[in-house]
Amino acid sequence: MDFFNKFSQGLAESSTPKSSIYYSEEKDPDTKKDEAIEIGLKSQESYYQRQLREQLARDNMMAASRQPIQPLQPTIHITPQPVPTATPAPILLPSSTAPTPKPRQQTNTSSDMSNLFDWLSEDTDAPASSLLPALTPSNAVQDIISKFNKDQKTTTPPSTQPSQTLPTTTCTQQSDGNISCTTPTVTPPQPPIVATVCTPTPTGGTVCTTAQQNPNPGAASQQNLDDMALKDLMSSVEKDMHQLQAETNDLVTNVYDAREYTRRAIDQILQLVKGFERFQK
């Protein structure tokens, strides 16, 4: 009986295809849930696409209805500048001690200037001399230059180092009336030159030697190396380092030789002990 039931059940399962309506209706709950989610996502995507198309259409309609905006033209305001008026220079009394410069050589422009003054005097009642600004005498310029040079010398602060001096500007007036000022260049003292040479030793260490050379001749020298050139100094240091390295190599070689000699001596003693034990047996 059980065999008949199993046979009928197997026959029913084999005769029902998977593509039938009965099988398609019985779906897995997870599959139904996934299909519902997929349908919801597709509907949501289509909704947002429709909203985007409508918004783009509204923007195009609004852009077409608007008129182009004309850019604003910049406005330029021109403010007239007042013409500067020449103020006459004050007349300074000439100094009796200052040398009188040579007068300038007049060219053909003097006749043109005199004609211009005559023409101005004919048009106005004022004399031609009143139309010219007051000029500063050349002796007053010499006084200003002398006072400037004197102030430069008196206001120069004393230097803390005797070997360093501050530059002083000196102004002079040439024969043609031009004023030239000169400032001497002062070279600052150079810092001392320090050279360091390091040499590795066979044992793994490093030996360094430092030498200092002061190029300033006015500085107080506390070492005899100041009078030696830098090239000679470096060659001397290198020679000393080579000699020191050779001595170190000899010392290390002697230590190695002593260690080897001790090892051989111990081996010989052990051989003698073994031979003595064999002799006793």
Swiss-Prot record:
Q: Give any Pfam family that matches.
A: Orthopox_A5L
Q: Which regions are flagged for Polar residues bias?
A: 1-22, 94-112
This protein's record includes keyword Repeat = no
Induction field = Expressed in the late phase of the viral replicative cycle.
Compartments where located: Virion; Host endoplasmic reticulum-Golgi intermediate compartment membrane
Stretches of Basic and acidic residues bias are at: 24-33
Where is the stretch described as Disordered? 1-33, 91-112, 149-192
Q: Which family does it belong to?
A: Belongs to the orthopoxvirus OPG130 family.
On assembly, the entry states: Interacts with OPG136 and its cleaved form.
The protein's name in its UniProt record:
39kDa core protein OPG130
Source lineage: Viruses, Varidnaviria, Bamfordvirae, Nucleocytoviricota, Pokkesviricetes
